[in-house]
Curated annotation (Swiss-Prot):
One of its GO terms (molecular function) is magnesium ion binding. GO terms for cellular component: cytoplasm. Its EC number is 2.7.8.7. Transfers the 4'-phosphopantetheine moiety from coenzyme A to a Ser of acyl-carrier-protein. It comes from Aquifex aeolicus (strain VF5). It is found in: Cytoplasm. It catalyses: apo-[ACP] + CoA = holo-[ACP] + adenosine 3',5'-bisphosphate + H(+). This is Holo-[acyl-carrier-protein] synthase. One of its GO terms (biological process) is fatty acid biosynthetic process. NCBIfam families: acpS, pantethn_trn.
Length: 122
């Protein structure tokens, strides 16, 4: 199953300016924030992860009929390699033993985009 999302980076900037740490704490995990602060241009990094979480959420719901919250989806950076997706939700471990969640993130100027793919492990 595939999920796709695109977000205007300005939208994330507006949410950050309006809600501050409350927004960050509700959407992103500690490890995601640490990565974005340390390794990337902060705003596009956040926006790409927002799009990634949306894409994973869409693919996950379509495949399994399980609605995930943003903070239950963790997209961890791997400099030079594809990001790692971790689902932090009780009860899905059994499902994920047989599936792999793959995400690709990108950002360019004003937009960030993500594609998520859930595939059965071989």
């Amino acid at each position: 199953m595939i999920g796709v999302d695109i977000v205007k980076n300005e939208r994330i900037k507006d949410a950050l300016e309006r809600f501050g740490d409350k927004f960050l704490d509700r959407i992103y995990t500690k490890r995601e924030l640490e990565y974005c602060y340390a390794h990337c241009d902060f705003l596009p990094c956040l926006a790409a992860r927002w799009a990634g979480k949306e894409a994973v959420l869409k693919a996950f719901y379509t495949e399994f009929k399980i609605f995930l919250r943003f903070k239950e989806i963790e997209i961890l950076g791997n400099r030079g390699r594809p990001p790692t997706v971790v689902i932090n939700r009780e009860g899905v471990e059994e499902i994920l033993k047989n599936y792999e969640v793959i995400v690709s993130l990108s950002h360019e100027r004003d937009y960030s985009v993500a594609v998520a793919y859930i595939k059965k492990k071989s």
